[in-house]
């Protein structure tokens, strides 16, 4: 039985069709357990996930030029096992694995591989965004681990009736509902004027490629604790704190702007069943807030918290519809934001560490992921950035350090205004204030400056002596 694509799937389909033969719609991650597991039982557990989560078995085709999907029959699969002597050898494999395209039609949209690295077992999975999202990968980790433990004790795994196909009917009902009409009205009225573009970095020419690279860093336990303590005491989420710091930075480097816009992903799963179902649900929303240089960091956090509550009530409305409405209303092309900010905290009870791999492409100039999924005492910050815009990972590292510096200031002095926030790191301030102004040189101490000037003029009479703006 063939079914139409949902709106989130259609967006991925269009993207993959445009960037054919690329890995742009791949999503890839792995989990490593704290010990070695039996690969035969782990293979059975993975197969059980494929059997029960029918969304994994979705396959795609075109009928009369339109995309369609169907659930392929389940057949037991031999999951390959790869053994690596070092983490470095595994990293080479994983990064290559993540960047191998998944074919759009004619076959399965995922690939599992069991891996063993330095005495630890785990598995890596790559899937098309047509059938999965970041939440789905948390389900993989949780369910496959649970299935392994159940099978290892000889117990039976209960059946479930989770099917992504059910979401097609849910979406159809939403598109005919009063809720949809209210959401459409909200977003149509949200931007009476053209939203100001919050540019992260100016480019002398249009970006023609979406090739990307990735940079990651980890906060210290002390910094992580100070962030968590501040958020708890202030009654705000960690996502809001990180977003506030990024918005303050964007406001400072876009001096003329009176508002700042970033993109945020939304789970788009409203029921327990949807939260237990593998599939592509996730959507994007523009988050726009007024930012004045005189508002305090505390006020910015409060404004963002209110903005979250407001737009989350209308999160089901498709982003492409939002974008189309604004484009038609204000006659513009392009995107609404340069920066996507994603705070990931979906927990799993699996006793292991998750890792995520880049597919080598990035739709947005900069995508920042703040990861708090492994019950760790340290946040991981990952930046995917377009290499045509940003020259190197050193540039991204500097940018992240600026953001972390702003967060530190907000945490220690929340009444600091946006205008007062330092947007340079301590090392940058040292360079700008002291190193660049270190003009001391040796010169003959027995002569006056006007004598030295006269002698220099006699030696090089045709050289420029003074520059003022465009005059010499």
Question: Locations of the language-model features?
Answer:
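Short amphipathic alpha-helices and their capping loops
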Residues: 1-20, 43-89, 93, 106-108, ...
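AMP-binding/adenylate-forming domain of the ANL superfamily
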Residues: 2-17, 90-94, 137-138, 181-182, ...
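Active-site-proximal acidic secondary-structure segment that organizes catalysis
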Residues: 2-4, 8, 115-165, 393-412
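Short, flexible turn/loop "capping" segments at secondary-structure junctions
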Residues: 20-26, 72-74, 117, 124, ...
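Acyl activation and transfer enzymes in specialized metabolism, enriched
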Residues: 33-57, 125-142, 213-257, 295-299, ...
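Short, low-complexity Ser/Thr-rich regulatory SLiMs
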Residues: 60-62, 114-118, 370-374
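His-Asp-centered acyl/peptidyl-transfer active-site segments
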Residues: 16-27, 54-56, 106, 120, ...
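A short, small/polar-residue-rich loop/turn motif at beta-strand boundaries
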Residues: 1-4, 35-51, 70-106, 184, ...
């Amino acid at each position: 039985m063939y079914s139409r694509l949902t709106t989130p799937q259609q967006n991925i389909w269009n993207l993959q069709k445009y960037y054919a033969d690329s890995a742009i719609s791949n999503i890839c991650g792995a989990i490593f357990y704290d010990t070695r597991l039996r690969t035969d039982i782990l293979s059975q557990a993975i197969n059980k996930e494929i059997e029960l989560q029918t969304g994994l078995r979705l396959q795609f085709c075109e009928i009369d030029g339109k995309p369609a999907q169907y659930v392929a029959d389940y057949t037991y699969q031999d999951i390959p096992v790869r053994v690596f002597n070092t983490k470095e050898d595994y990293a080479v494999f994983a990064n290559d694995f993540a960047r191998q395209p998944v074919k759009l039609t004619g076959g399965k949209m995922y690939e599992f591989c069991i891996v063993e690295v330095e005495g630890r077992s785990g598995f890596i999975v790559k899937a098309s965004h047509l059938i999965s999202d970041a939440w789905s990968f948390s389900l993989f980790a949780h369910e496959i681990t649970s299935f392994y433990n159940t099978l290892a004790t000889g117990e039976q795994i209960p059946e479930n009736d989770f099917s992504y196909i059910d979401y097609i009917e849910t979406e159809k009902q939403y598109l005919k509902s009063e809720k949809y009409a209210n959401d459409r009205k909200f977003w149509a009225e949200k931007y009476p004027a053209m939203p100001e573009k919050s540019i992260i970095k100016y480019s002398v020419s249009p970006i023609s490629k979406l090739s990307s690279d990735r940079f990651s860093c980890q906060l210290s336990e002390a910094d992580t604790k100070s962030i968590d303590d501040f958020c708890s005491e202030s009654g705000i989420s960690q996502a809001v704190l990180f977003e506030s710091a990024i918005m303050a930075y964007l406001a400072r480097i876009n001096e003329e702007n009176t508002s700042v816009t970033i993109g945020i992903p939304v789970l788009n799963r409203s029921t327990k069943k949807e939260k237990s179902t593998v599939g592509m649900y996730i959507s994007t929303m523009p988050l726009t807030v007024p930012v004045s240089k005189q508002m305090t960091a505390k006020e910015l956090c409060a404004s963002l918290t209110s903005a979250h509550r407001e737009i989350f009530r209308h999160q089901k409305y498709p982003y492409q519809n939002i974008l189309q409405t604004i484009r038609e209303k204000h006659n513009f092309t392009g995107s609404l934001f340069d920066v996507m900010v994603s705070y990931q905290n979906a927990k799993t009870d699996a006793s292991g560490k998750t890792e995520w791999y880049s597919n080598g492409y990035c739709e947005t100039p900069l995508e920042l992921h703040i990861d708090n999924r492994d019950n760790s005492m340290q946040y991981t910050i990952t930046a995917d950035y377009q290499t045509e815009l940003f020259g190197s990972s050193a540039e991204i590292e500097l940018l992240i350090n600026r953001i972390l510096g702003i967060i530190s200031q907000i945490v220690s002095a929340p009444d600091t205004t946006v205008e007062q926030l330092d947007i340079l790191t301590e090392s940058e301030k040292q360079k700008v204030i002291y190193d660049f102004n270190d003009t001391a040189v040796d010169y003959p101490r027995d002569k006056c400056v006007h004598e030295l000037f006269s002698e220099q003029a006699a030696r090089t009479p045709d050289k420029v002596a003074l520059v003022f703006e465009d005059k010499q």
